[in-house]
Amino acid sequence: LNKIKISAVSYTNTKPFIYGIEHSALLDQIDLSLDIPTDCAAKLIDGQVDIGLIPVAAIPHVPNANIVADYCIGSVGAVNSVFIFSKVPVAEIKTVRLDSQSRTSNNLAKVLLKFHFKQAVSYVTDEPIDADAIVLIGDRTFGRRDDFPFAYDMGEEWMNFTGLPFVYAAWVANKAIPQGFINDFNQALAFGLSKRKELLLDLPKLDNFDLEDYLLHKLDFELTDKKREALALFLSYIAKL
């Protein structure tokens, strides 16, 4: 039997899913790789993998894209790991440096700045350029909030803007996946989520970041109807950028 190739994100927010997959009978049926979000998306788009936990902004670029899990990386309001960090208040932001690791967060920043904050901003991607603000996501944001005079949590700002939760990444396939596998996969993800407290014991303690609050409360992993609505709305805003 051909193994199903899966690319998942290497960040802490995905560890419950990985835990569930690694403690399930699926291990014999899959090839699992851990990547940064942009690489998860690239592998799925290029057909190097069958399923990926991909930044949602990449979904329109995936051939035959279909969401195969009832779980996602999401939040209802503040998420505490997807930020616009700024030297100036948002009304004064003129230049923003984007994050090379995620298309979704860059697009979310653009959508919020244009439609929510009504700011005309120019975007740069090069490290050396000194911008007013930067987009930063994932583990690289842990404990960084105090390094900047202004921090805008994009999950919180999206909620302020739309009244909806947000989906940062979803489990997407680029082909039809057998329903039996999908059922087992969802069970594995649910099991991993149920073991978050145990998982925390194995994670390194961070002085300046509350991992327990992050994994148990800030992140919201169920792909609800409201999150699906938010996803469709977000993709429609990206199309208007």
Language-model segments: residues:
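Domain-level signature for soluble enzymes in the chorismate/prephenate branch of the shikimate pathway
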Residues: L1-L241
